[in-house]
Amino acid sequence: MRERVFVGGAPFLGICVGMQLLATTGVEHGDTPGLGWIPGEVRLIERTDRAIKVPHMGWNDVQIRPHAALVEAGEAYFLHSYHFVPDDGHHALAMTDHGGGLVAAVGRDNLIGVQFHPEKSQTYGLALLARFLDWKP
């Protein structure tokens, strides 16, 4: 897979845990190495407010950053207890608010990862998947 993505330039889309695997490391089952394709760490969502539920489950707004590729603003379905914190903030393509800002999408070169579930996000998610299939990074 690494050769197809980095040598061959094949577009890569990671969804939910697939996005988290792009990180350097995660903490879900102790310190766990990721692929390291986008430097960063996956951390447990901290409950700073008792009203905030973990896991983050349900519909939430996706706010894009000015440099976002493929991802558009809209509403998507999320289900996760951990979140990706990229080392370089430029790799964060979109954010969502769940008791504070959480990265909703990451990317660089021919890699895109989304924390939400496009397959459950109705029209918004189908549009993202269609853009990915047509993407020529």
Q: Which functions belong to the PLM regions below?
A:
Residues 1-56:
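Cysteine-nucleophile active-site neighborhood
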